[in-house]
A protein has these predicted regions:
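The substrate-binding groove and active-site-proximal loops of carbohydrate-active enzymes
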Residues: 17-25, 67-88, 221
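Alpha-helical scaffolding within the catalytic cores
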Residues: 50-56, 91-96, 200-205
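Stable alpha-helical elements in mature extracytoplasmic
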Residues: 29-33, 89-96, 231-238
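Aromatic-Pro/Gly-enriched surface loop or interdomain linker
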Residues: 1-61, 222, 236-245
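A glycine-rich, often tryptophan-bearing local segment used as a flexible ligand/cofactor-contacting loop or short
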Residues: 73-180, 191, 196
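Solvent-exposed loop/turn segments at secondary-structure junctions
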Residues: 51-54, 69-75, 107, 113-117, ...
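Loop/turn elements at helix/coil->beta-strand transitions in domains of secreted/extracellular proteins
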Residues: 38-45, 60-64, 102-107, 189-190, ...
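A glycine-centered loop/beta-turn motif at secondary-structure junctions
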Residues: 106, 134-135, 143, 162, ...
Length: 245
């Protein structure tokens, strides 16, 4: 009886990853993005979200901004006595991005909870949704969009050659896993789907081709694409699109 109780004390589950090292937050994602940027023939520099939100960095100095959001979303720390932290895109960052794009700046952003946090986060407001629609030109179409991480590019004016790629959805040593990629729905006539999840055919990424600026929004973190060549091909296509404005 005691042996049986011991085996169930912490819950019953499989032991697939019991002896394996699992990647967490390695904090090197600007380098991963940067490698794909450099391989595409562009130079880059990096800064923190906080530096941008607090005005230490002028986004207007750069023709293209790549916003790395990863799996960040609003949450509490410990028992939650200090309130909520880690919004995917804070109010101040929203202001900076809205001003940047209104003045002609071109934006790439990727993450798995960006729209979910703006729509359903514990601090979300109607203004958050309007920011997504008016600045990101996208809206929340749902989470849990893919278990396989397989994505393909339909033939569009964004990418005429068919591209397939896979992002990580299982625990691994190389990069963190994406449990809930989101469906990114285009908003407006000038916004359209450029990537789809292979098994559901739902929208995985959206491009906006406006009169004054362009944006690309991925519903999964760019850095979790498992193949270096696939990352570079996608980044090259994105930068080519964003550079045309």
């Amino acid at each position: 009886a005691y042996s049986e109780n011991d085996s169930h004390a912490l819950g019953t589950s499989y032991s697939d990853y019991e002896t394996r090292v699992i990647a967490g937050n390695t904090f090197d994602y600007p380098a991963i993005h940067g490698e794909a940027i450099a391989q595409s023939g562009y130079s880059y520099t990096s800064a923190s979200h906080k530096a941008v939100a607090e005005g230490h960095i002028s986004l207007g100095d750069y023709p293209i901004v790549d916003l790395i959001v990863g799996k960040q979303r609003t949450t509490t720390i410990g028992r939650g006595v200090s309130g909520y932290h880690y919004e995917a895109i804070s109010d101040k960052l929203q202001e900076a991005l809205s001003l940047y794009t209104a003045e002609g700046g071109n934006l790439l952003l990727s993450g798995s909870y960006i729209l979910d946090d703006l729509w359903h986060g514990p601090m979300s407001t109607d203004e958050d949704k309007e920011f997504a629609k008016n600045t990101l030109h996208s809206s929340f179409g749902g989470g849990m969009a893919s278990r396989s991480g397989e994505v393909y590019a339909p033939s569009t004016k964004f990418l005429r050659k068919r591209l397939t790629l896979t992002f990580n959805t299982t625990p691994s040593e190389e990069v963190y896993s994406v449990e809930s990629p989101e469906v990114v729905t285009p908003v407006g006539k000038q916004s359209y789907t450029i990537l789809r999840y292979a098994h559901s055919d739902r929208s995985a990424a959206v491009a906006y081709n406006g009169p004054d600026n362009r944006t690309v929004h991925l519903g999964f973190p760019f850095e979790t694409i498992t193949d270096d060549e696939e990352r570079t091909k996608l980044m090259a296509a994105i930068l080519k699109f964003l550079s045309k404005n």
